[in-house]
């Protein structure tokens, strides 16, 4: 069954934006919105491991934030969330390139309605801090979702809002077939961000969840 056979398009306004959202129905039953959560990188000891800083490993933080987010979404019957790494030992691909390709393949073949990739940042300058969200293109559903997620994270965690940015070269943004975004939660190399990334992983997940809820007009 394809989405077009069950899709209902309507126009609504959320926080001043004119938006078109697809709400999926089968008969009189609303179908769950499918969100693919990509926890960036692979476990320690394998290819495509992440950044490090202040004793923290990116791949460990992204894994746990993703688990928290999936649990929040899957406890709401309006959503169906899947993880790229359902266990902390899950390894995707055999090289950096195939690791990224596997994440995209999983999302496209499901197929997901939205794709959210979770990462942590680093910088040689330890004073650089804050949250950033990357998109393939502006004036899209991904941008509107990203703005609400950014607001949610800043409210829940208190990181600096570094804005919504374009990076169409990112593989997971340019090869996915649905609205996609990549969140850099904060900088592992900044002491303040690192403390938040260590202690506030559930709050990061809840901020993302809150943004998703607001995007759909559920909160």
What spans do the regions from the language model cover?
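Short, Lys/Arg-enriched N-terminal segments with co-localized hydrophobic residues
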Residues: 9-30
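Extreme N-terminal basic, low-complexity initiation segments
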Residues: 2-8
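Sec-exported extracytoplasmic/periplasmic mature domains
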Residues: 67-78, 108-112, 150-158, 209, ...
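Catalytic-core regions of hydrolytic enzymes
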Residues: 25-131, 135-144
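Conserved beta-strand segments of alpha/beta enzyme cores
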Residues: 80-82, 163, 179
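Active-site-adjacent mobile loop/cap segments within catalytic or ligand-binding domains
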Residues: 33-36, 47, 105, 110, ...
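Active-site-adjacent substrate-binding region
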Residues: 140-166
